[in-house]
Amino acid sequence: MKLSFTKVSLTNILILFNCLFIIFSMIVLTFGVIPQIYLLKFANILHGVRPSIFPIVCFTGSFVIIVACVGIIGLMKGGKCLLTMHIIALIIATIIDISTATLSAIKQNEFLTKAGQVLNDSSKLYYKNRLYATEFDLMHITFKCCNVKNDYSLLGTLHLIPESCTHGIEFYKQQCNEPLNKYVRYYIDILIYLCFIFGFIKLIYSLFTFTQRQRIFSEKTPVA
């Protein structure tokens, strides 16, 4: 009965780890989805600019949930082929996560620069595009910033600084890409830590499971 207990215990531990991977992936998905939903409020003036880590972790998070379910089925049903596919897929997802987190850590100012360029271009259409004006007003009020300057139209009419750029008699002097980047960096930093920490856990799990796969499927449960 000792062999049977060892096999059952090992299988249960691996199943537990896969359940934890599902929970972890849901957490990663949450931190990847929330900022993207928020940035949709400014989708037009940002022209879809967003940190690449957000859509990537959403994809890998969803992918890992499926992979973990496949692993659980493989462990419960004794499917060696399923478990092998599970290990390979998990390693691929882990490599993608760690690579993305590394690049995001290196290119910390990438979104700041791109957002600044796009917002400056979009601000020129503030008085020409109602939708742009609405999104800029929301951004100004939310982040206490201003990206629209005094401007003369083709007819020589002076466009004053928008009311959304003011607070009482004071004007917001800060460019909007800076507070927007601060908001985005909060989620990026969390995702970087999560990707590294849980990425290494998944990598260790994958290597351990790979080395133990023969033991999992070769031991036979004695008949009582």
UniProtKB/Swiss-Prot annotation:
Residues 1-12, 74-80, 211-224 are cytoplasmic. SUPFAM superfamilies: Tetraspanin. The keyword Cell wall biogenesis/degradation does not apply. Keywords: Glycoprotein, Membrane, Transmembrane, Transmembrane helix. GO terms for cellular component: membrane. Residues 34-52, 102-189 are extracellular. The keyword Transmembrane helix applies. It comes from the Eukaryota. The chain crosses the membrane at residues 13-33, 53-73, 81-101, 190-210. It is a multi-pass membrane protein. It is found in: Membrane. Glycans are attached at N120. Belongs to the tetraspanin (TM4SF) family. This is 25 kDa integral membrane protein.
